[in-house]
Amino acid sequence: MDMRKEQYESERPSAAFPFESRYVDVLGHRIHYIEEGRGAPVLFVHGNPTSSYLWRNVLPAVATDTRGRGIALDLPGFGRSGKLADGNYSLDLYYRVLEGFIENLGLKDLVLVLHDWGGPLGMMYAVRHRDNVKAVALMETFLWDTSWKDYGKFKTVFKLFRSPIGYLMIQVMNFFVNKILPGSVIRTENMTREVMDHYRQPFPTAASRKPVRVFPQLIPIEGRPETSRLFIEEIEDNLRRLDIPVLWIKATPGAIITSNTEYRLVALAARMPRLAVKEFGSGLHYLQEEDPRRLAELIAEWIKGQNLHNLPSETDNILFDAA
């Protein structure tokens, strides 16, 4: 057992969330966010059913190591951000809020760190605001119209999520938070009661869980829904114009990029010549709960390697480098 792994196993990642809560009004929505550090901004964007809490053990380390300003927001309906009275959550809403958040905080020359639904949302910002994004780090996300064959053993459950039964499963039973979230982490011992209580806290009622149900319905699968397909197509059509460093952090066995879907990543690399792939090691979907120290190291070392913050270069941008 190597020293890093031994140290990790002796120190379970902290469940604490010791950040000052900050709020900003974006398009009439009360958006919660956290930040730490000074310098060039590194913006962390979560997916379903998480929040800025997901980044609690990653953001401070990245901000310190890169001498940057780490920022993580909660999308509407998640974390401590406000919920929509009409429950009308949509991909367009989430994008406009992300775009407005960046504008309201005056964030310039961004590095984006994106997970799950944060991937399409952040990449849409990158292709529409190429002059304001310096680099993008991605993990366990998608930038393509998916296929049912991509889902493997989860095909049935995601079909149910997109059916009327999804209301019972996700909003009444809280299945996504209670089962999918902890079940998508290999190191289950990390998903302690305290951690799960943090993740459950924003969703005390069936109505409050509406955004958790909406995201599975929005996933572009074989061209549906059309709004999501068009959203993804705009990103795909502009990837070659995005002349910035892009990092993909790949876990084994992974959940979105697996041995059966790695062809997706190869196809993406063909469109993005500045894409680097770094191996995370053992993990499923929520890598932030697997080994946040490892994740922070990969992100920070890569950022420094691009010399974005005028720091000494320590890494090379090489496709499928198993650093």
PLM regions: where:
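N-terminal cap/lid subdomain of alpha/beta-hydrolase-fold enzymes
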Residues: 60, 73-76
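Active-site helix-initiating loop/hinge in glycosyltransferases
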Residues: 47, 290-291
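Alpha/beta-hydrolase-fold serine-hydrolase catalytic core, especially in secreted/extracellular enzymes
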Residues: 306-323
